C-alpha cells in the first residue's frame, strides 16, 4: 500500500493488548482535514479498550466526508456479560455524531469497523436508531462463496458493519464482501470456503 501512495492515521489507544484503530486512505481521492480519537469512559469492570477514530477529509468532488472507525470491546466473557461495554462504545459514538450534526446537520457520515456485534444486536441497533444511520452491510455477501465476514465451526457471521448517513445511502447501489479467491481457503472440516487467516 505504501508503494501505491496510501497513507494512514491511527489512534494511540489505551487498549490493554496494545491494539489501535487506523484508517488507510489515498491522498489522491481523500484530502485529510483532521483526525481525533474518542476514548471510551473507563469503569472498574471494563479493561482499557480501543478508541474510536474520527477522520474528516475532502473527497475528489469537493464534499467533506466524516469517517468514524470502530473496533468495539470484545465478547470475552460472553456476549451478555460484555454487552454493556459495547453499549458504552455506542453511546460514546452517538454523542460524537450528535456533536458533529450540531455543527453540520447534513454531514456525510460513514461508521465502519469491527463492532463485535451482529447487525441485530443492541449496540448496532442503538447507533443506527439514535445516530440516524443505515447499516448497508447487514445483508452483504461475497461473489466467491463468502456469506459473511467470518466463519466459525461452519457458521457464517458478520461482526463487521458499515453504517451511513441517509444522504450517502442514496448513492450506494450495493454492498458486498471482498472475497477474492486469494482471500479464501477450503474449509476442510465443514465444507465450502472460509476467510484465509
Short names for language-model regions:
Residues 80-105:
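A long, amphipathic alpha-helix that forms part
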Residues 34-36, 77-82, 123:
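A short secondary-structure junction signal
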Residues 47, 56, 98-109, 117-197:
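Metal-dependent phosphoester-hydrolase catalytic domains
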Residues 1-21, 90-91, 106-108, 186-194:
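N-terminal, active-site-proximal structural segment of metallo-dependent hydrolase catalytic domains
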Residues 18, 75-76, 118-121:
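Short catalytic/ligand-binding loop motif for oxyanion handling, primarily in non-cytosolic enzymes
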Residues 10-11, 41-43, 76-86, 111-113, ...:
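Second-shell loop/turn segments in exported
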Residues 71, 113-114:
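Active-site glycine-centered loops adjacent to acidic/histidine catalytic or metal-binding residues
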Residues 1-73:
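Structured beta-strand-rich core segments of catalytic domains in phosphoester-bond hydrolases
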Amino acid at each position: 500500500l505504501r508503494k501505491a501512495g496510501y497513507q494512514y492515521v491511527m489512534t494511540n489507544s489505551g487498549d490493554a493488548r496494545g491494539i489501535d484503530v487506523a484508517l488507510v486512505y489515498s491522498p489522491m481521492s481523500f484530502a485529510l482535514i483532521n483526525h481525533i480519537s474518542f476514548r471510551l469512559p473507563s469503569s472498574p469492570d471494563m479493561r482499557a479498550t480501543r478508541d474510536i477514530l474520527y477522520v474528516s477529509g475532502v473527497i475528489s468532488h469537493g464534499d467533506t466526508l466524516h469517517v468514524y472507525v470502530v473496533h468495539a470491546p470484545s465478547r470475552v466473557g460472553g456476549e451478555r456479560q460484555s454487552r454493556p461495554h459495547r453499549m458504552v462504545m455506542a453511546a460514546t459514538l452517538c454523542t460524537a455524531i450528535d456533536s458533529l450534526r450540531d455543527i453540520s446537520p447534513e454531514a456525510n457520515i460513514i461508521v465502519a469497523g469491527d463492532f463485535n456485534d451482529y447487525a441485530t444486536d443492541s449496540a448496532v441497533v442503538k447507533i443506527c436508531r439514535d445516530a440516524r444511520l443505515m447499516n448497508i452491510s447487514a445483508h452483504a455477501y461475497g461473489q466467491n462463496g463468502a456469506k459473511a465476514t467470518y466463519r466459525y465451526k461452519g457458521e457464517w457471521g458478520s461482526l463487521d458493519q458499515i453504517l451511513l448517513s441517509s444522504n450517502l445511502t442514496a448513492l450506494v447501489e450495493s454492498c458486498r464482501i471482498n472475497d477474492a479467491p486469494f482471500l479464501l481457503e477450503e474449509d476442510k472440516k465443514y465444507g465450502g470456503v472460509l476467510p484465509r487467516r
